[in-house]
């Protein structure tokens, strides 16, 4: 870092009791009071360089000159006083702002004397400070102590312009970075890490700035248009990780604020909130400029710090654009207040999903013409038609990417449902709404969804039958794997109609496989046998489908398995036949009573035969007829 020395005389200032004096053969004739400190000085050296002191002495006959609100305090005043006496002073990036403001206050300009302090400081500032990377940043940091003076003297704006111009003109000049050079010395970084770090060499250095100065600097860098959006995003991530407290610490801050509304806690939260909202306003508009994980971390902090609704909605919109990159842990956003009974903020995730579905609602384009006619037409195409084809191909790729994204998001949502299902205070409506927000085609299988439903039913054992049916109506039994079906068959938390539906579709699969010649034997597949055996059903004797009363079993763990089916103790409580009859009566009351309009999805769910008892006989008779034919 650069510095400048002015004057040649040794320092003769000394302290006597409560006074600061100058050792001289001439007695002092001038008393100045600055910030409670008194100086016994001489008029001639001071008045010859300070126009303000000249005017104050001529206007006031008092022997003591008061300098209230002196910029920089006694340190800055003493620098100016020593300059007047010709005593050696050292000016650097750390004290040039204080010295410049003090010199301006005392009016040490060229009007009073050529080569005065203001002129010398300006020359050093423009020729040395602004040309140095580290000097510019340090000087900009020191302007925080003198915001009004620094703005009036254009010190702040000139430092910001100098920093931005160096970032824009030297994007690969890593040697400028103080933080990067220090890190390379301390850390033996790999070549890949060093290369990635060198691209954003400036990010860590300007991260030392306060949020107001940082925001203005980043605006200047962004307006230059030469720095890629990804590097802007990396710089914001570096700054957020440095100044935003961790989420755990944030939660403690919020909890303390709720427990005791002290001014200090309120100020801390307000500062963090301002910092967060400023970072959000600086986010690049380009998709992928910042990672989805970073956006969701900002959203978590926004929820905890109670940021503005507009800031949270902006983050939700940005997250929706790249939601397929998120993980389940990223979506576990804590609620706004510790007073909330819910473990996670499900509403904000529902908003993100809604935004994701809205921006992905583009119909896939139709396929191009094929065949000889299409080939002949293709030969006669004009250049404009070729351009249309290119747009068509881009549209297809975009549509394919959208479809792939929805498949990933569906998997993500099912994993998220498994996590929030453990919350005993999670309302049924929120769980169902979130499960239904995913398009049906995006779930290739329903195993993860079934696992989430199973967890929810076990965590909410006080649900009545209609509520359990409402939870299960989004489940498509045709998309369950063999393992999931076998688990569902012994899951006493499921509505019995779902169990029957599982058996029905498994039998239908077995029959279809037999008709297609995939089975040379008339025996039921082993998984169907296991399902029926779990309910004490003899597949060879439909009339003997009596179901013995059993004792209830303990609910399986969240990670269900089929090992329980092999145990002779694994049975459903109550008789299946009586429960089917009871279940049928409840369905009829629900469909014909005061249930109102029946949702279309629920109608599809109830598309199995109307009388489950007859359905069981029908299933078994199909198998029996098949056996007779092969005899």
Swiss-Prot record:
Pathway: Protein modification; protein ubiquitination. Residues 200-509 form the NPH3 domain. It comes from the Eukaryota. The modification Phosphotyrosine is found at residue 450. The BTB/POZ domain mediates the interaction with some component of ubiquitin ligase complexes. May act as a substrate-specific adapter of an E3 ubiquitin-protein ligase complex (CUL3-RBX1-BTB) which mediates the ubiquitination and subsequent proteasomal degradation of target proteins. This is BTB/POZ domain-containing protein At1g67900. The lineage of its organism: Eukaryota, Viridiplantae, Streptophyta, Embryophyta, Tracheophyta.
